């Protein structure tokens, strides 16, 4: 086990540590503001840089279709049978944004094949620790077997991990480990970096890759986003998109039963 040394410590910041300073503006109307992002690999434009999380309590076909109608993206969660997930993907009406999550072990190859058969064009390799050899092998398999799929992978917490996933072939990287509302990775394992610091670290590597003429995946801020201000801070820090879970949970578009007391 690696031992901690003084040089291993560094200051990190979370959303609550930062406030943006108001600046002079020549924007007459908020309607003039353009937050859209063009996803080259999907040949589609997202009017809003927001993705609904592939959580069992957040995204199934209803949420995915709603996100698409609002200009965002929804990723169908993987915590169901292959046949049921396949059915959910088939219910997505926008053929440009059929997205779902898979794991990296077990039935993931069989699952992915079944999803591609019903028009999947975006896959999220969904694991707690994205900087891992199994993720590397999964990305290698997906890129070689389904080269036209838009590939999201993660989660990672450092610029070096972002760089590795870039080299492995990810098109987008989910950034932050263990800071979501129900994610306990940071607490249970003692590992993680606050989302804002993770974004900044990854963005610095992204700039370096672009300066060197290399492909640089989209950065997806994922975890600990509690309000619209956190979304703004994420984008200001260098994220291209944000992934929301708790902010969307409990809405009528989410799966689950309504309980009344």
Predicted regions and their residues:
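An N-cap/entry alpha-helix motif that binds or orients negatively charged groups
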Residues: 1-50
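Alpha/beta enzyme core
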Residues: 2-7, 12, 18, 59-260
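N-terminal cofactor/phosphate-binding cores enriched in small/glycine residues
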Residues: 32-39, 43, 47-78
